[in-house]
Amino acid sequence: AEFTAKTPYYYSTFEAEIEKPNGERYVHNESVVTDKKKVIVLGSGPNRIGQGIEFDYSCVHGVLAAKECGYETIMINCNPETVSTDFDTADKLYFEPVFWEHIYDIIQHEKPEGVIVQLGGQTALKIAEKLAKYGIKIIGTSFDALDLAEDRGRFSDLLTDLKIPFPQFGIAETADEASALADTLDFPLLIRPSYVLGGQGMKIVINKQEL
């Protein structure tokens, strides 16, 4: 208000849309698109249990590394407490929720070389499937490789195929299945869901009652 702002912060609105000749629609964006090669880095969103500030550290170093390689860096994150949302970290900052509908519109506007999801924790990793489905390049580890690592069942099958030893385990989708599975395994048991990081939803149980 008191002086001209030079900070490349962008906040979206759903009031104006652009329609391509093929009928595809996305939100209008005032950000000036350059002809530089560029990458988008997805942040981790707000801090919460199971996902801490270490992913912000990863995002910042990812942005700096991309800059050193000559890329224009575009950060998408919505946490004002992080370093990745500082005005002098990335070339552009979209202060947006790390949700698909926001990210897709930005990708359609900026047309990056690809998207980096591996640095933003579980929040960013969950976007990988959508990116792969829509044919948007994921820089680095592919969605299938990410899913292979996060799906406990697929990962254990891989370990079996590679003859790598691992603790006894089982997969249950209902309480009854978990109870029956516990009869075949010895307590204490480490119970945890797939597709989480940082121990979210993890519990050690020592008997059926705790299970």
Model-derived features: positions:
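N-terminal beta-alpha lobe that positions the nucleotide/phosphoryl donor
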Residues: A1-L211
